[in-house]
Amino acid sequence: MSSSITPSLIAADLFSVDRLVAVVTGGATGIGLMIVKALEENGAKVYIIGRRKEVLDKVAKEEAKHGNIIPLQGDASSKPDLERIVAHITKETGYINLLVANAGISGPDPVRITPSTTLSELQRDLWSLDPSIFAQTFSVNVGTAYFSIAAFLPLLDAGNHKGNVVQSSQAIITSSIGAFGRVPLAHYAYSASKAAVTHMTKQFATALTKYKIRFNILAPGLYPSEMTAGIVKSFEQLSPEERATRVSPLGREGNTEDMAGCILWLASKAGAWLSGNVVVSDGGKLSVTPSSY
């Protein structure tokens, strides 16, 4: 049945996140901060979760355009911390419309394979990794998203009942193009963890259909952040031709406007009919590298 609401094709209405209430884990730096700024500047109330109180407070003080960035210190991989944060938001606001599970780590250093690398050298590098570091990469990049989703389901459900926005409640999980690339740009553990969290999110999209809670995946390419600072700096010296090959066909890394465009589309009425989708924002990188996407 079609909606009885008269549709608006005005961009300011279609992409509006005014009155939206969001939670962003890992929201104080990098892509998370880009998402937070885009949402808050356009009228959303945004709770940001992170471990470093001083960084959270600085973001709330310096980046909020409307005073609606609320810092909540906590570790998104800790169930007690998540329970405490959910209780706080439940008491203060009572609902959320959007969860952005963005917290993650880069994992071990990549295993480099050059034309001169011998099989014995490769085997040595693969075998030398501490199993606990491999496991930690999965625990943070997959487990943190899993427990964040589980923790905030009641508040997302409450958002549907609140009806303060037209679109139904949603969780957006930050993955990576590393989930799809066959030439690993990071360690195998990182790429595999991002492939895992991508598939898990698709399963949630299917499993929770009847509850009207949507799930989508954001898969960025190279964006500037604390994790990618060294990579971005090393690419500054490349020629335009090399940048088009190694960074993206567009010859640059992503920026705040690129990420803002993605999140405003997904989080607003414009993205209300999306669930179970993967949104790749990589300047075309996957289109010119071996990948399974």
Swiss-Prot record:
Q: Any idea which positions bind NADP(+)?
A: 31, 102, 190, 194, 225
EC no.? 1.-.-.-
Which cysteines pair up through disulfides? They are none
Q: Which GO terms describe its molecular function?
A: oxidoreductase activity
The record's listing under Pfam families reads: adh_short_C2
InterPro entries, A to Z: NAD(P)-bd_dom_sf, Sc_DH/Rdtase_CS, SDR_fam, Sec_Metab_Biosynth_SDR
**Keyword Oxidoreductase listed:** yes
Q: Report the enzyme's class at the first EC level.
A: oxidoreductase
Q: Which PROSITE patterns match?
A: ADH_SHORT
Q: Does the keyword Phosphoprotein apply?
A: no
Record keywords = NADP, Oxidoreductase, Virulence
- Active-site residues, as the UniProt record annotates them: 175 (proton donor), 190 (proton acceptor), 194 (lowers pka of active site tyr)
The record's annotation in SUPFAM superfamilies points to: NAD(P)-binding Rossmann-fold domains
Its family remark reads:
Belongs to the short-chain dehydrogenases/reductases (SDR) family.
- What does this chain do? Short-chain dehydrogenase/reductase; part of the gene cluster that mediates the biosynthesis of the phomopsins, a group of hexapeptide mycotoxins which infects lupins and causes lupinosis disease in livestock. The role of phomF' within the phomopsins biosynthesis pathway has still to be determined. The pathway starts with the processing of the precursor phomA by several endopeptidases including kexin proteases as well as the cluster-specific S41 family peptidase phomP1 and the oligopeptidase phomG to produce 10 identical copies of the hexapeptide Tyr-Val-Ile-Pro-Ile-Asp.
Please name the PANTHER family in this protein's record: 7-ALPHA-HYDROXYSTEROID DEHYDROGENASE, SHORT CHAIN DEHYDROGENASE_REDUCTASE FAMILY (AFU_ORTHOLOGUE AFUA_5G12480)
Tell me the protein's name. Short-chain dehydrogenase/reductase PhomF'
> To which species is this protein native?
Diaporthe leptostromiformis
Q: What is the lineage of its organism?
A: Eukaryota, Fungi, Dikarya, Ascomycota, Pezizomycotina
